[in-house]
Amino acid sequence: MANITDFTEKQFEDRLEKNVERLTKNRLAVESPTAFLLGGQPGSGKTSLRSAISEETQGNVVIIDNDTFKQQHPNFDELVKLYEKDVVKYVTPYSNRMTEAIISRLRDKGYNLVIEGTGRTTDVPIQTATMLQAKDYETKMYVMAVPKINSYLGTIERYETMYADDPMTARATPKQAHDIVVKNLPTNLETLHKTGLFSDIRLYNREGVKLYSSLETPSISPKETLERELNRKVSGKEIQPTLERIEQKMVQNQHQETPEFKAIQQKMESLQPPTPPIPKTPKLPGI
């Protein structure tokens, strides 16, 4: 009996052809292609980097997002029934292979590429940049610089949104996985900066403001700027709307008993101004 995670070469090749056709529609190969590698901790909002890249390339860029290939596994529905929230673990080998195959196919033709990642390690960006430069690509790295409290809340909000859409496949990002990237990203970015593999390393906030460019300040490492933004204190005014949105979604999903819900409520209570003490009524003489 075949393993439910298995798929045939024909199934894979057929889907690969469809993906390549879809991704390259209205896109043109160029003489001097550029590959943009994206980084940032989970929940930081890496999709917002696409706006800056689209503007830079006049929209002529192919976005390769590993997550979008997971549901393409030929047996995805059966795997969901069997593994539910753990399904991602069983379809990731498929999505990884699809990502690699698409990059290989498009790099040979010279399309501008956006390749999503996190920056949790330095190995993958170095290998990817080296491989693409062998095909005469210019390689750049654009990274989200977002306070860690904002990105962690982003992972919770994303999960609650996914849960409302499909409880069986909604998968939370463990806080530990988020925090590992937060801890490693500044040092990893400094290492990547020193390799000289990237013609430009940029840091952007969620508003699309460029906070750093190695092209503009080549002697300065991105590490300090990123650490400062990751650890920046966030005002109550800045964080309150996010907390309220998450609380509302968690109530709708009936997640009031979760530790995350209790933590959200505690944080919201801490942002409320203290209640002024009730003044004591002065005693009148003889009473």
From Swiss-Prot:
The keyword Oxidoreductase does not apply. GO terms for molecular function: ATP binding; kinase activity. It catalyses: UDP-N-acetyl-alpha-D-glucosamine + ATP = UDP-N-acetyl-alpha-D-glucosamine 3'-phosphate + ADP + H(+). InterPro entries: P-loop_NTPase, Zeta_toxin_domain. Belongs to the zeta toxin family. Toxic component of a type II toxin-antitoxin (TA) system. Phosphorylates UDP-N-acetyl-D-glucosamine (UNAG) on the 3'-hydroxyl group of the N-acetyl-D-glucosamine moiety, yielding UNAG-3P. UNAG-3P inhibits MurA, the first committed step in cell wall synthesis, which is then blocked. Phosphorylation is inhibited by epsilon antitoxin. Part of a postsegregational killing (PSK) system involved in the killing of plasmid-free cells. The zeta toxin induces programmed cell death. In the presence of the epsilon antitoxin, forms an inactive PezA(2)PezT(2) heterotetramer. This is Toxin zeta. It comes from Enterococcus faecalis (Streptococcus faecalis). The lineage of its organism: Bacteria, Bacillati, Bacillota, Bacilli, Lactobacillales.
